[in-house]
Amino acid sequence: MADVTFISSSIVRPQIINQEGREKIHLTPFDLNLLYVDYTQRGLLFPKPDPETHFISRLRTSLSSALDIYFPFAGRLNKVENHEDETVSFYINCDGSGAKFIHAVSDSVSVSDLLRPDGSVPDFFRIFYPMNGVKSIDGLSEPLLALQVTEMRDGVFIGFGYNHMVADGASIWNFFRTWSKICSNGQRENLQPLALKGLFVDGMDFPIHIPVSDTETSPPSRELSPTFKERVFHFTKRNISDLKAKVNGEIGLRDHKVSSLQAVSAHMWRSIIRHSGLNQEEKTRCFVAVDLRQRLNPPLDKECFGHVIYNSVVTTTVGELHDQGLGWAFLQINNMLRSLTNEDYRIYAENWVRNMKIQKSGLGSKMTRDSVIVSSSPRFEVYDNDFGWGKPIAVRAGPSNSISGKLVFFRGIEEGCIDVHAFLLPDVLVKLLADVEFLEKCG
């Protein structure tokens, strides 16, 4: 177990609190469905800076400037009681209350303890992330963003947790890029003002009214079970090329039409389910988090801030997934993503309002063996975040919202590579690591 000493915890507020036009952000059905979901956790590992640079002070000061631009992260979740129909409504109050900044030290941990050659993730790593067990609805009293800077023996880990109703992966990494730029050069003159996603669901009344009975009692916090194991699987550029060639060989697509993300997702899905101990006739699902920004009609700004994610799903049987091959599995994912339309998103939002079923934890407690959940994206430029003492040497996902089959995709540190941070049941992982067919496509 690693020893972590917490040096300080403070609230960092925006440098300039200008309330004009920033008072309130209404929440869509896509946001409100996450009311009881854990804060999303991610982290970047850096080389250790020279202490003479006073980097902790620089990080804190530049965070204040970054929050002036990304002001929703400095707000709080607010609840309004609608007594006329016994419902409640939620919105983001951009009041400048601030984000949490934690400074910690762990002299007993080195970079090699975290970046193990076999890709395994130590159990103690969870204490390097803030907001463990905190859910979106807790944003009524908790900061919407928390950051923990942990000094290690030979490195620094910046772990963070954020309220997923406020932002998605694209937005949090855009925030990090802005924060790192301000920290490294001290300037913000050329940075663009924040463009919010807006209320992109046409014909819907806001704020949305939710029955009080659905919000009175938060489900108990679900800590990461010790039965789950984490592993980072590294796919080299050659591995990915081989997977895409195999897809082409089975279904005849040209290579440039084969998505690297979808090919690796299909490979992981087939391999994990093959070792999950399910009967051939049982159903299996692959969930994929889809960015709606450019899929809506009209499309949103590519850089707009907010949570703009739709969870799409492919369903088949265990037997069919195994028998039909990698190319077929890829095609199911590809066809599902290509077939999504603006009408699908509109119908989902309208149905959610009519028959509210708030997601309680992750994507459902029953999905421990029969599903995989593909989240994040190798498109996110995680390795470009230089705070002034060098670029990151690794990126990791925290333990929140973890069920077996959760797959968090990151770009690899080498160009063209993909790292998959996987959360699996121990018996599934043991079988996967003995699977030659799986390992020969994984570096």
Swiss-Prot record:
- The reply on keyword Oxidoreductase is no
Q: Which residues form the active site?
A: H164 (proton acceptor), D386 (proton acceptor)
* Segments forming a coiled coil: none
A Pfam family that this protein carries is Transferase
Q: Which organism is it from?
A: Arabidopsis thaliana (Mouse-ear cress)
Family assignment from sequence similarity:
Belongs to the plant acyltransferase family.
Stated EC number for the protein is: 2.3.1.-
Keywords of this entry? Acyltransferase, Transferase
Chain ranges passing through the membrane? none
Taxonomic superkingdom: Eukaryota
Q: Where is the signal peptide?
A: none
| Name this protein carries in UniProt | Uncharacterized acetyltransferase At3g50280
Question: By its UniProt entry, which InterPro entries does this protein fall under?
Answer: CAT-like_dom_sf (IPR023213), Sec_Metabolite_Acyltrans (IPR051283)
Q: What is the lineage of its organism?
A: Eukaryota, Viridiplantae, Streptophyta, Embryophyta, Tracheophyta
Q: What would you give as a GO molecular function for this chain, any one? A: acyltransferase activity
